[in-house]
């Protein structure tokens, strides 16, 4: 797992572990293996305000809405940063226990590569991505705290480039606070989405 962490930190930013036969273990055993492997990379952190550490992504029959996380619906998810409305984890893992009969595709994109593409082709819009956007928190906060948070897509701390991007949360955030996303911000989000979706 040391090599995996090195690849995450200094390599392409993702890796696939595919030598473990899911048919040889129960669901609980697979979760335990996932927990152990994850712990060898970093300390696991909650995926929700309620403290959920391992989070099932499945269709619960709910419809997308301002208080419903999209990963609990059958809605297709765009490329996004998990938990972008609060504090996204440094690493993110996904374990496939059972593939869907239909749909359920997963993909990976690099927000660093997207940043560099935006810098080359859309520098003015990239500047807007360094300024805050409203993000819907989908009820993932303590009572009485704001329902939306405000964060830029990109920030640089002098050492590392940090990124959080979720178009759905941005659009819903502006709707929640009763404000209109500025035209430059809308174009920046749409262009970023196009860059991430390009083959």
Predicted segment positions?
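Active-site environment of non-heme Fe oxygenases that use a 2-His-1-carboxylate facial triad
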Residues: 1-3, 10, 15, 22-24, ...
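A short alpha->loop->secondary-structure connector
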Residues: 34-45
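"Short basic amphipathic alpha-helical interaction patches in structured regions
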Residues: 28-35, 110
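Contiguous, non-catalytic segments that form substrate-binding/exosite surfaces or channel walls
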Residues: 49
């Amino acid at each position: 797992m040391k090599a995996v962490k090195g690849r995450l930190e200094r390599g392409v930013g993702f890796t696939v572990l595919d030598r473990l036969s899911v048919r040889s273990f129960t669901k609980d055993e697979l979760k335990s293996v996932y927990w152990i492997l994850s712990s060898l990379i970093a300390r696991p952190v909650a995926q929700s305000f309620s403290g959920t550490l391992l989070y099932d992504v499945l269709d619960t029959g709910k419809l997308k809405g301002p208080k419903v996380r999209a990963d609990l619906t059958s809605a297709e998810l765009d490329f996004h940063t998990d938990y972008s409305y609060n504090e996204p984890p440094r690493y993110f893992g996904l374990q496939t226990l059972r593939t869907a009969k239909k749909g359920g595709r997963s993909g990976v994109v690099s927000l660093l590569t997207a940043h560099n593409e935006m810098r080359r082709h859309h520098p003015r819009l990239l500047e807007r991505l360094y300024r805050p956007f409203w993000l819907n928190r989908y009820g993932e906060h303590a009572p009485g705290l704001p329902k939306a948070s405000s964060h830029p897509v990109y920030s640089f701390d002098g050492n590392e480039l940090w990124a959080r991007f979720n178009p759905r949360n941005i659009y819903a955030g502006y709707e929640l606070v009763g404000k209109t996303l500025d035209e430059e911000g809308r174009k920046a989000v749409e262009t970023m989405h196009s860059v991430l979706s390009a083959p």
